[in-house]
């Protein structure tokens, strides 16, 4: 039977931690264990959560690191079942944080993982040997499709590798899919005649949950070379469903909107390394935007590195691009490259738009700074 080891930080006093850990293990699976007749206990024992270890970690201060093993009894494992099993009832506990889920290999193999990953995206943009440069089509909300075209043109002339829709650019009457995707691609093609380069346009996929697959197919039919999803606004299972659809055969970028309420507390919620790293890679994200450690809304540097490690470590799945975002400017580029290495997408949005010479000049300055930040 497949197994999941769930790792928790329990910030309660260590005095009764053994009892609490056992209640956590049984409460998520075979509750109420103590009240079961002996015959029922024997039937349920194979499916009962079991405490594997209880340790202290000085880096977390007071409290304990508790590891519980859960058998996976369902035939087709899915993220809703897994998260409900390992953290469903515990999410009401104010002093328990889920740090990691350690999956047995046979369980990992049942999830799709990235379709393109780092190597595939590099092939699309034809850039090797340095981090990729990404910017965002900001300020498009409420403005005409002609204005959007001009902004995409400026980004393309500036030499940006990847141009992403703003995550708040939804289906508006001033920038509907049917006009926005062709306008963006036309701007890229126009600039390519002069630059010889074709940046990757990442189209924000929005709409009602049960319409997303059809919306994705429509966008791809219009020529969209990549898509972005605000994953946790919909649910991680939605990302997996998109990735497993053979007709949705373009890279999918995962945005971390809404996850702050789940990750920010040290004592409660789900760790960024798991929520934004391991799970999104398993579900099929080719690249993941997450708060950089450099801005006011950023995660701490150690956790940012753990997110990167979960996305890029060698496993049976393709590696996914980390995209630390927010709080990055021209002065931070060298630091990002030093901290995250070559296999990172550096997302510079506001600084490119605010550049004194405009977006095109900002893009060129971005590439120049990136190339000089060795």
Curated annotation (Swiss-Prot):
Keywords per UniProt: Amino-acid biosynthesis, Isomerase, Magnesium, Metal-binding, Methionine biosynthesis
Known partners and oligomeric status: Homodimer.
Protein name: Putative 2,3-diketo-5-methylthiopentyl-1-phosphate enolase
Protein species of origin: Shouchella clausii (strain KSM-K16) (Alkalihalobacillus clausii)
UniProt: Mg(2+) binding residues: 166
EC number: 5.3.2.5
Cofactor(s) the protein requires to work: Mg(2+)
Functional description taken from the UniProt entry: Catalyzes the enolization of 2,3-diketo-5-methylthiopentyl-1-phosphate (DK-MTP-1-P) into 2-hydroxy-3-keto-5-methylthiopentenyl-1-phosphate (HK-MTPenyl-1-P).
Database matches in Gene3D superfamilies: Ribulose bisphosphate carboxylase, large subunit, C-terminal domain, RuBisCO large subunit, N-terminal domain
Gene: mtnW
């Amino acid at each position: 039977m497949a197994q999941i080891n769930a790792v928790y930080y329990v910030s309660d006093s260590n005095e009764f931690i053994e009892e609490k850990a056992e209640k956590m293990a049984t409460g998520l699976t075979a509750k109420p264990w103590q009240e079961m007749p002996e015959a029922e206990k024997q039937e349920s024992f194979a499916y009962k959560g079991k405490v594997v270890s209880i340790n202290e970690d000085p880096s977390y201060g007071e409290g304990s690191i508790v590891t519980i093993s859960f058998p996976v009894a369902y035939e087709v494992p899915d993220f809703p079942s897994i998260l409900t099993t390992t953290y469903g009832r515990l999410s009401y506990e104010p002093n328990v944080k889920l740090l990691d889920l350690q999956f047995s290999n046979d369980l990992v193999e049942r999830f799709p993982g990235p379709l393109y990953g780092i190597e595939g995206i590099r092939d699309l943009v034809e850039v090797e040997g340095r981090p990729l440069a990404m910017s965002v089509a900001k300020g498009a909300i409420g403005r005409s499709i002609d204005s959007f075209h001009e902004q995409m043109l400026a980004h393309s002339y500036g030499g940006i590798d990847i141009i992403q829709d703003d995550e708040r650019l939804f289906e508006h009457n001033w920038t509907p899919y049917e006009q926005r995707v062709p306008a963006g691609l036309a701007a890229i093609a126009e600039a390519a005649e002069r630059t010889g380069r074709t940046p990757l346009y990442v189209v924000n996929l929005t709409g009602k949950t049960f319409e997303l697959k059809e919306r994705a197919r429509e966008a791809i039919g219009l020529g969209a070379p990549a898509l972005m999803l605000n994953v946790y606004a919909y649910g991680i299972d939605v990302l997996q469903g998109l990735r497993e659809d053979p007709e949705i055969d373009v890279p999918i970028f995962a945005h971390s909107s809404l996850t702050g309420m789940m990750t920010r507390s040290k004592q409660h919620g789900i760790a960024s390394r798991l929520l934004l790293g391991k799970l999104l890679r398993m579900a099929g994200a080719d690249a993941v935007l997450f708060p950089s450690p450099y801005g006011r809304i950023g995660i701490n540097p150690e956790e940012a590195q753990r997110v990167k490690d979960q996305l890029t470590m060698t496993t049976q799945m393709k590696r996914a691009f980390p995209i630390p975002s927010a709080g990055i400017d021209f002065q931070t580029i060298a630091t990002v490259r030093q901290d995250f290495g070559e296999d990172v997408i550096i997302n510079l949005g506001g600084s490119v738009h605010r550049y004194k010479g405009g977006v095109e000049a900002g893009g060129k300055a971005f590439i120049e700074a990136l190339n000089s930040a060795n």
